[in-house]
Amino acid sequence: MISFSDGNIHDIDHFVRVWNYAKTIAELEEIDPETPLILEVAAITHDIACPLCREKYGNTNGKHQEEEGVPLVKAFLSDSGMTEAQIERVAFLVGHHHTFEEIDGLDWQILIEADYIANATENGYSKCCHSC
């Protein structure tokens, strides 16, 4: 993914943050044994379409990321050794990581939360109760 990101430090930092948050949340939730692999791969690849979206649309709008990311992540993972079902679930998560309705699994919920926390941190959001 680092090569795929064309060395964009923001993108690399972001997907590593999302992966770290997702991994931590999953460990604390004690989820089933197969889900962490799918979740962690989805966390690392969730913004796989950002370079393409910047080039094609001039921005990284979430809906564009979801649409463009599915075929990219399927191709990226095609020789990874993951099963077709695992790749399909990762692709589904990449294709829905900006969709907050009808969340159908803990992997999707955790990915949404991890991405939100990373975005909030990167954008300086805070719920500070005292003067900083």
Model-identified regions with their sequence ranges:
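Short coil/turn segments at secondary-structure junctions
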Residues: 2-6, 53-60
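Active-site-proximal substrate-binding core of FAD-dependent oxidoreductases
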Residues: 84-91
